[in-house]
């Protein structure tokens, strides 16, 4: 059972009733009872329980430089944070972000990935012993290829590896079951793309990076069993081609920096005869979808008050 995250200001006389993390705010747990795939009509009928900053702080766009990242990077970070938002009870944000993910990955594949990631989080993942250094290099190389040097340079120089506001969010959500796991996964990938390897390692501890790698392997049908095959068939070609390149780059980098990771027994060996999309087609689809991420995620939504 998930929980809704509400941040509130309380007096000293009642502060002991909640789990407080600062002198001016606390975290209140409220049971969550809404299914994963809610249509807009049902989401609209839910009471406006999401607190503006506690929920907005979990949105991908709250991460500096996110809007300049290429589509695959946005999809991976967004997928993890979408599940964090659901566990936190931020229903309007969940649906709005999910619509953005649909545009990149397709409806069927995205829904299957959401469910698969939830299953992985509950304990259905193996230890891949992923090299964060190699994954960071692979993510940066793919970003350079997809978005072009100038855009990547602007993204990588947008911030340093330490961000006080993001760290404050992390300090709270890491204490919340499931929310913290998904948030750590999303920000581990984010910092890896930003070439903040130490920060990515910090967020990727306790299996978060392994979870992300398992997700990548599922997207190309090399993990997840029948689910992986369904996802691979349904995933949009441009995104799938990006994942295939990313995995290839990872193994190239991993072979240079570390010994080969342990391979799951049920995972086939990666071959170069996977489906390829030409670079021109990839860039064309990327350009046609990139603008969607710049739009506001929420419209006509009533938020509760929040104080840090």
UniProtKB/Swiss-Prot annotation:
It is found in: Secreted. InterPro entries: APOF. Keywords: Cholesterol metabolism, Cleavage on pair of basic residues, HDL, LDL, Lipid metabolism, Lipid transport, Secreted, Signal, Steroid metabolism, Sterol metabolism, Transport. One of its GO terms (biological process) is triglyceride metabolic process. One of its GO terms (cellular component) is low-density lipoprotein particle. Pfam families: Apolipo_F (PF15148). Belongs to the apolipoprotein F family. Minor apolipoprotein that associates with LDL. Inhibits cholesteryl ester transfer protein (CETP) activity and appears to be an important regulator of cholesterol transport. Also associates to a lesser degree with VLDL, Apo-AI and Apo-AII. This is Apolipoprotein F. It comes from Rattus norvegicus.
């Amino acid at each position: 059972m998930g929980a809704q995250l509400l941040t509130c200001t309380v007096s000293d006389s009642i502060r002991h009733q909640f789990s407080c993390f600062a002198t001016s705010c606390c975290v209140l747990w409220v049971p969550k009872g809404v299914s994963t795939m809610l249509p807009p009509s049902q989401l609209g009928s839910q009471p406006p329980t999401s607190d503006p900053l506690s929920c907005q702080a979990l949105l991908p766009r709250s991460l500096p430089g996110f809007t300049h990242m290429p589509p695959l990077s946005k999809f991976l970070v967004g997928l993890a944070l979408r599940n964090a938002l659901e566990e936190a009870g931020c229903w309007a944000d969940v649906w709005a972000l999910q619509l953005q993910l649909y545009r990149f990955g397709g409806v069927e594949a995205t829904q299957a990935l959401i469910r698969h990631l939830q299953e992985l989080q509950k304990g259905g993942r193996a230890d891949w012993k992923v090299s964060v250094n190699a994954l960071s290099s692979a993510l940066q190389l793919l970003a350079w290829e997809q978005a072009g040097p100038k855009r990547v340079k602007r993204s990588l120089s947008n911030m340093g590896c330490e961000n006080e506001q993001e760290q404050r969010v992390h300090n709270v959500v890491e204490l919340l079951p499931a929310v913290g796991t998904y948030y750590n996964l999303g920000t581990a990938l984010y910092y890896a793309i930003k070439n903040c390897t130490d920060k990515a390692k910090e967020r990727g501890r306790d299996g978060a990076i392994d979870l992300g790698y398992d997700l990548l392997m599922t997207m190309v049908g090399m993990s997840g069993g029948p689910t992986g095959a369904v996802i691979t068939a349904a995933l949009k070609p441009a995104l799938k081609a990006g994942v295939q390149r990313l995995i290839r780059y990872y193994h190239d980098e991993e072979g240079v920096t570390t010994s080969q990771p342990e391979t799951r027994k049920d995972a086939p060996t990666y071959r170069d005869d996977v489906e390829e999309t030409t670079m021109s087609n990839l860039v064309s689809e990327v350009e046609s979808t990139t603008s969607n991420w710049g739009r506001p995620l929420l419209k006509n939504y009533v938020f509760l008050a929040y104080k840090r």
